[in-house]
Amino acid sequence: MNIDNDLRRIALQEQQLQFERFDLDTAWKLGATLRRMAGERKLGCVIDITLYSMQVFYAALDGATPDNPNWVRRKRNTVFRLFKSSYATGLSLLKQQTNLQAKLGLPDAEFAAHGGSFPIVVKGTGCIGAVTVSGLPQREDHNLVVEALAELLGADHDALKLES
């Protein structure tokens, strides 16, 4: 893994994986896509889609743990605060050899700079929410979200995915 390459690729993901419009039907389709992918692969995780103050999709799959919803909340809070993916935030902080508490005063109990939460962006509007997965290693959480977004938006996942 090369942090600079990953950060460039995540910036491209965040630029290209944006919606023309996003409503509750779109949230359901995105959540169902993630649920199908995770179920087919037998991934024990929690899936959450929240539009700021309203949770609009939630699923927990076999193998998820009681800690996963808290990880979802903390990663989602990071996206809501910084308007970029929690994985990009974590990699940026790793590169700077710091953390959210030291750099921004954000407590670990409320924020997590670990992969798995991705901003839901509507073109011309900005970040309106976050889609979050927790339960896998952080890079896999992030990759699953990106794959589902790419499928739903008709984007070329192979051109967007992080290198192995």
UniProtKB/Swiss-Prot annotation:
* Family to which the UniProt record says this protein belongs: Belongs to the UPF0303 family.
Q: Which NCBIfam families match?
A: PRK02487.1-5
> What PANTHER family does the record point to?
PTHR28255, UPF0303 PROTEIN YBR137W (PTHR28255:SF1)
Q: What is this protein called?
A: UPF0303 protein R02983
Q: Which HAMAP family match?
A: UPF0303
Gene3D superfamilies xref list: Haem-degrading domain (3.30.450.150)
